[in-house]
């Protein structure tokens, strides 16, 4: 069976979510680290890490450490967006995550990025790409996705 949990920083978003029974509302800046008592196969974090100040990195990495594998995307410098307080480079995120007990899996990252692009180009895609002006590879993972292995759990 498939089981998952979500972590959201906004009370309002948590309340409005259709699946709020599996979402934990948690602010990594004010609530500290969040650790789950169970281990998950995968932690998936899309366009989140740039929303937390660098001083609180350990707080959300504690959540990531509850999974055997980690896939993240990040906002690049000057991407701009609501509460983007830590836009940074790929090298920065590689250093931050690997220095906290994960191993970067370059081969899997490359494969997942390629698969993301293939899915985007697939005419059966649920998103009508013709209506998205100027997007050559719109899915975040295609250009800013990173995949890691958790050395502590593998």
Regions of interest found by a model, annotated:
Residues 98-99, 125:
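Disordered, low-complexity tails and leader-like regions
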Residues 1-83, 87-94, 98, 148-150:
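Conserved SAM-binding loop
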Residues 31-33, 111-116:
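A short acidic, often aromatic-flanked loop/helix-cap motif at beta-alpha or helix-coil junctions
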Residues 87, 110, 119-121:
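General N-terminal targeting signals
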Residues 118-154:
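Core SAM-dependent methyltransferase catalytic element
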Residues 9, 102-114, 129:
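Conserved S-adenosyl-L-methionine
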């Amino acid at each position: 069976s498939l089981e998952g949990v979500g972590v959201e920083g906004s009370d309002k978003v948590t309340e409005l979510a259709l699946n709020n029974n599996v979402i934990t509302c948690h602010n990594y800046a004010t609530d500290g680290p969040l650790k789950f008592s169970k281990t998950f196969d995968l932690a998936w974090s899309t366009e989140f890490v740039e929303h937390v100040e660098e001083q609180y990195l350990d707080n959300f990495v504690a959540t990531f450490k509850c999974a055997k594998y980690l896939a993240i995307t990040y906002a690049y410098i000057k991407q701009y967006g609501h509460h983007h307080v830590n836009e940074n480079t790929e090298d920065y995120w590689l250093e931050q995550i690997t220095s906290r007990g994960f191993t970067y899996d370059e081969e899997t990252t490359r494969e997942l990025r390629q698969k993301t692009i293939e899915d985007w180009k697939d005419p059966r895609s649920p998103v009508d790409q013709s209506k998205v002006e100027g997007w050559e590879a719109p899915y975040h993972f295609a250009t800013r996705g990173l995949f890691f292995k958790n050395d502590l759990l593998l």
